[in-house]
């Protein structure tokens, strides 16, 4: 478990942008049992690629005109059971953090794994997310 002085700023980076934190398996199930519409789920991490790439990219992407109906996050390595439950909704993908998933009507429609995040800037990540939003989300 990581100390709070490390994890809290990582949490607040997303929750401060409106992402709902899912800290327990029940939280995840509740979010996933509302299958209507779209939900962006960020699997957060304390690693540098989460801090410098994934979180900034996700926050930038949700400034677009077409955005998911809901945004949520689980914290890998901290809220382990919640993260494991979230990953159970992503069949066919190996555990990866950070990662970003888009669900539509309860089904996984887009997945950005760690290897697609590493070495890229926030704008590049946001661009890919915005393309997925344009394909799967309604306009504002």
Where in the sequence are the language-model features?
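N-terminal leader/targeting and pre-domain segments
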Residues: 1-38, 137-140
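Short His-Asn-centered micro-motif
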Residues: 24, 43-44, 52, 74
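Short active-site neighborhood of thiol/selenol oxidoreductases, capturing the structured segment around
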Residues: 35-47
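Thiol-based oxidoreductase modules, predominantly thioredoxin-like and allied folds used
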Residues: 43, 66-85
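Typically the conserved alpha-helix immediately C-terminal to a functionally engaged Cys/Sec
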Residues: 51-64
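Short, well-ordered amphipathic alpha-helices
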Residues: 57-59, 86-87, 133
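Short acidic (Asp/Glu) patches
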Residues: 83-97
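Non-catalytic, surface beta->alpha helical segment in thiol-disulfide oxidoreductase systems
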Residues: 93-140
């Amino acid at each position: 478990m990581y100390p709070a002085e490390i994890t809290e700023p990582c949490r607040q980076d997303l929750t401060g942008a409106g992402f709902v934190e899912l800290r327990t398996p029940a939280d995840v199930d509740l979010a996933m049992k509302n299958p209507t519409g779209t939900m962006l789920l960020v699997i957060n991490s304390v690693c540098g690629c989460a801090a410098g790439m994934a979180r900034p990219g996700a926050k930038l992407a949700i400034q677009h005109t077409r955005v998911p109906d809901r945004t949520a996050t689980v914290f890998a390595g901290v809220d382990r059971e919640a993260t494991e439950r979230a990953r159970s909704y992503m069949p066919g993908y190996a555990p990866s953090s950070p990662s970003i998933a888009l669900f539509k009507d309860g089904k996984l429609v887009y997945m950005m794994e760690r290897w697609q995040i590493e070495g890229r800037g926030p704008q590049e990540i946001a661009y890919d997310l915005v393309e997925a939003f344009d394909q799967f989300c309604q306009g504002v």
